[in-house]
């Protein structure tokens, strides 16, 4: 009898043990849609290659509810409003160190990707080519390196591209200017390229190419951008030659900065046709001749900086501007001009200096 009781006891113990869930069993599948599950995989892979997060932006990046992650924004999918998906990532000014993994290509519904002012290394993954609805891409002020990220040329919905303040180098593909971008910022990199022949095809409103090397003269085809262009920043871009007369056709430009270059010749009088111009800076070039009165007569002009050139005359109307800088030129009877020992011959096309 004792033996039978022992057998029954062991039998029921085994049944009870087998009926309990194993501690080593696979976890149940999450009750989320496949797109959010892919987002979970992508974001966990990204978190795995983040080496420093001093402001704890990714501290709450755990669990399947990715819509509650800091910096992650969800919305109805563009192709199916009944499905929630990750539509945006904003980690601006987080000071995060790490890399961008290929797994980010799983975020196929991503429309906005902002990670400016961090310390991300490496390159933009080729898997970004899967982000067919990506509208804004801002990876500025990081430590990205290598050649121009050509993967951005394959993004059909991209309108805003900001890759400035990185360590990118080499040529900028001419195909970039065929893209229908609203804004383009490629400044403060190590790019070196010639002005593209198809520049005028670009519909950008902001053309910012400061602190890079662009060889040659500004092409006259820039006039073809007159409908969209309202800001031109070409400071310290290794520009040479003369400014084209066609600049006067840019009726919507408000800011024009070509300072710290090697431009020569006269300022085109046609700039007086840029009726919406508010700020113009041509300082630190080798421009000469007379300042056109048409520029100083612009109705919305607030600031005109033409210091450190070789202008020899300025009309009285320029003296009436509230905010102007004409120092270090060759203008008679004006203060803080160049000494006679700094120049010997000034022509409309070139300047010969006697001393540095």
Predicted regions and their residues:
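Surface-exposed cap/linker segments adjacent to membranes
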Residues: 2-76, 344-354
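LRR N-terminal entry segment and analogous cap-like coil->beta motifs
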Residues: 77-127
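Leucine-rich repeat
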Residues: 83, 105-110, 129-134, 153-158, ...
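Consensus "Asn ladder" position of solenoid repeat domains
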Residues: 94, 115-118, 139-142, 163-166, ...
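The feature encodes a structural signal of leucine-rich repeats
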Residues: 100-105, 124-126, 145-150, 169-174, ...
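Right-handed parallel beta-helix
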Residues: 112-165
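Eukaryotic tandem repeat interaction scaffolds
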Residues: 192-287
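Leucine-rich repeat domain C-terminal region
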Residues: 274, 278-288, 293-354
């Amino acid at each position: 009898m004792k033996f039978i009781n022992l057998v029954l006891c062991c039998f029921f113990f085994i049944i009870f043990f087998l009926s309990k869930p194993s501690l080593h069993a696979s976890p149940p599948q999450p009750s989320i849609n496949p797109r959010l599950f892919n987002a979970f995989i992508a974001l966990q892979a990204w978190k795995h290659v983040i080496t420093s997060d001093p402001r704890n932006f990714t501290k709450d990046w755990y669990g399947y509810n990715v819509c509650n992650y800091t910096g992650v924004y969800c919305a109805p999918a563009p192709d199916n409003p009944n499905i929630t998906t990750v539509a945006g990532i904003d980690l601006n000014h987080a000071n995060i160190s790490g890399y961008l993994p290929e797994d980010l290509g799983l975020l196929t519904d991503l429309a906005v990707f902002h990670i400016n002012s961090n310390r991300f290394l490496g390159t933009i993954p080729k898997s970004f080519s899967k982000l067919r609805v990506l509208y804004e891409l801002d990876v500025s002020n990081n430590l990205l390196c290598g050649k121009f990220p050509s993967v951005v040329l394959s993004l059909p919905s991209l309108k805003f591209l900001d890759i400035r303040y990185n360590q990118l180098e080499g040529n900028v593909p001419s195909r970039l200017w065929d893209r229908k971008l609203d804004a383009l910022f490629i400044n403060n990199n190590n790019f070196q390229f010639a002005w593209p022949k198809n520049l005028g095809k670009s519909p950008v409103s902001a053309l910012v190419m400061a602190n890079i090397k662009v060889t040659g003269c500004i092409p006259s085809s820039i006039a073809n951008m007159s409908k969209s262009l309202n800001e031109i920043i070409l400071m310290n871009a290794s520009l040479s030659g003369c400014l084209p007369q066609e600049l006067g056709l840019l009726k919507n430009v408000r800011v024009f900065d070509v300072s710290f270059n090697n431009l020569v010749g006269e300022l085109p009088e046609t700039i007086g046709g840029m009726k919406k111009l508010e700020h113009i800076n041509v300082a630190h070039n080798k421009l000469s001749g007379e300042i056109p009165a048409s520029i100083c007569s612009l109705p919305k002009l607030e600031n005109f900086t033409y210091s450190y050139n070789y202008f020899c005359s300025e009309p009285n109307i320029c003296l009436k501007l509230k905010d102007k800088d004409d120092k270090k030129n060759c203008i008679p009877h004006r203060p803080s001009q160049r000494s006679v020992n700094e120049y010997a011959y000034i022509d409309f096309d070139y300047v010969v200096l006697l001393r540095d």
